[in-house]
Amino acid sequence: MLPSQEASKLYHEHYMRNSRAIGVLWAIFTICFAIINVVVFIQPYWVGDSVSTPKPGYFGLFHYCVGSGLAGRELTCRGSFTDFSTIPSGAFKAAAFFVLLSMVLILGCITCFALFFFCNTATVYKICAWMQLLAALCLVLGCMIFPDGWDAETIRDMCGAKTGKYSLGDCSVRWAYILAIIGILNALILSFLAFVLGNRQTDLLQEELKQENKDFVGSTVSSVLRPGGDVSGWGVLPCPVAHTQGP
């Protein structure tokens, strides 16, 4: 084997080891993002009360709990995604839809992991990358639309008269909203990484095909040519010499 071929083989083996390790980490963080997505969709802790709010309570995308404002801290909870009429704002309904769509996309991406056993690796990476990018976009829309519903009467009763669209008044942002923003950054990074891995797999496949073609041509020529430079199967035939008789 030529030195260049040996170097190419070593590079290929080194890259494959690193690629598998990065791919495993990418898959693990994709599962983590899916868990984040499910949590922020279900949990009602997107915004909540503070020490200066008239009433205690907290709101999520579709589920919310609000107190009576009396000395007790008992909360009355309402809201269900299966019953849109219980969601206090149209903006909350739209935000819940986009976050749900993001969750479906990322769960579908995890399902696509099974395709690694049947399809081209580069193709699967690119499919997952697009799904992660769309999931991030849907989550961005959900986070941007959600504050548009802060002027709902139920939220104004809890957060005070200063509450309006994109203004929480006396209330504050809770951990689920912050976790959703972290999830957006996570999804964008995962999508970029999947595109890089997919394109690198495509380039590596092309390099392998070129190397195989070179090896095939080289082995064919080596098997045809003899060590002395003659072509095998085409030995030098003796040249007939005409003998003339003397007078």
From Swiss-Prot:
* Keywords tagged on the record: Cell membrane, Cell projection, Membrane, Postsynaptic cell membrane, Synapse, Transmembrane, Transmembrane helix
- Name any GO cellular component annotation: postsynaptic specialization
Task: Please give, as recorded in its UniProt entry, the membrane topology of this protein.
Answer: Multi-pass membrane protein
Q: Which residues cross the membrane?
A: 22-42, 97-117, 127-147, 178-198
Asked if the record carries the keyword Transmembrane helix, the reply is yes
Listed GO biological process terms: gamma-aminobutyric acid receptor clustering; neurotransmitter receptor localization to postsynaptic specialization membrane; regulation of inhibitory synapse assembly; sensory perception of sound
**InterPro entries from the xrefs?**
LHFPL
Q: Where in or outside the cell is it found?
A: Cell projection, Dendrite; Postsynaptic cell membrane
Coiled-coil annotated spans: none
Molecular function in Gene Ontology: GABA receptor binding
> Any keyword Transmembrane helix?
yes
Assembly description: Interacts with GABA(A) receptor subunits. Interacts with GABRB3. Interacts with GABRA2. Interacts with GABRG2. Identified in a complex of 720 kDa composed of LHFPL4, NLGN2, GABRA1, GABRB2, GABRG2 and GABRB3. Interacts with GABRA1. Interacts with NLGN2; leading to mutual regulation of protein level and synaptic clustering.
Task: Describe its function.
Answer: Plays a role in the regulation of inhibitory synapse formation and function by being involved in maintening gamma-aminobutyric acid receptors (GABAARs) clustering and their associated scaffold proteins at inhibitory synaptic sites. Acts in concert with NLGN2 to recruit or stabilize GABAARs.
Q: Which family, according to the similarity comment?
A: Belongs to the LHFP family.
State the name under which the record lists this protein: LHFPL tetraspan subfamily member 4 protein
Q: Which organism is it from?
A: Bos taurus
- Give the classification, highest ranks: Eukaryota, Metazoa, Chordata, Craniata, Vertebrata
